[in-house]
């Protein structure tokens, strides 16, 4: 099922392999299941589209379960107002949630006002470190990603990968330039129970292309809330160390609260 260059679309109750939305506006996808097993089997991609709602969907896919990209696949422009809620994701390969990779380097595109809430992530399995992350924002192609909210997300003991991956990067395999920035991202009521998570990464690119204004509220890992004032944290530790997050260069303002 493909929604292409369309407006005011409602899709409900279908089972398919993939359900991409490109160059479209005002789209609702409700109670749809996307299940794939072949290469490049992304579930529910969004390309250069605005005002898209996924509600009550299920994705088990052989590539990213759901993505938000700017210019890609013949669709042009940024993305605004994309919401996924009340849904379940199972990624046999790559990311459950992935934002930001593709865009038009000449247009400095923006992806903003993205919300993911009340979601269960059942699995994540990716051997390539560059493509790990249950909740992943990788800004490339001069894209700016901002105003993103992850809320009430429950992550089970996935097979292989990272919990969080926020990076401004220049992946020459897929991008023509690094991204411009990632900013104003909230992780609220995120729960992970398991022991397979590898080291998460939060890394900027340079002083002009930063990751900044990142907030974790009630991040709970194996029953322990990770906060700046948590009991048992040595004074010389970064709070991110307690979550097994690597915070690298060109990152500004990360807060962990109860």
Put a short name on every predicted segment.
Residues 1-258:
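Extracellular/periplasmic carbohydrate-active domains that bind, remodel
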């Amino acid at each position: 099922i493909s929604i292409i260059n369309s407006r005011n679309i409602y899709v409900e109750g279908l089972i398919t392999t993939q359900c991409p939305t490109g160059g479209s506006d005002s789209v609702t996808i409700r109670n749809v299941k996307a299940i794939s097993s072949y290469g490049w089997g992304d579930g529910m991609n969004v390309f250069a589209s605005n005002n898209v709602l996924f509600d009550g969907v299920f994705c088990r896919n052989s590539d990213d379960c759901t993505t938000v990209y700017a210019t890609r696949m013949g669709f042009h422009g940024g993305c605004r107002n994309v919401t996924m809620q009340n849904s379940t994701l199972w990624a046999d390969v790559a990311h459950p949630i992935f934002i930001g990779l593709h865009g038009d380097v000449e247009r400095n595109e923006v992806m903003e006002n993205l919300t993911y809430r009340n979601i269960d992530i059942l699995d994540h399995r990716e051997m390539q470190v560059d493509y790990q992350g249950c909740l992943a924002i990788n800004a490339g192609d001069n894209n700016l990603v901002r105003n993103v909210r992850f809320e009430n997300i429950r992550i089970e003991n996935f097979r292989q990968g990272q919990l969080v991956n926020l990076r401004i990067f220049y992946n020459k395999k897929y991008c023509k330039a690094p991204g411009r920035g990632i900013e104003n991202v909230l992780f609220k009521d995120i729960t992970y129970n398991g022991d397979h998570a590898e080291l998460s990464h939060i890394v900027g690119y340079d002083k002009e292309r930063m990751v900044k204004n990142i907030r974790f509220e009630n991040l709970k890992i194996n029953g322990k809330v990770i906060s700046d004032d948590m009991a048992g944290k040595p004074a010389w530790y970064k709070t991110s160390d307690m979550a097994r997050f690597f915070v690298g260069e060109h990152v500004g303002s990360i807060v962990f609260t109860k």
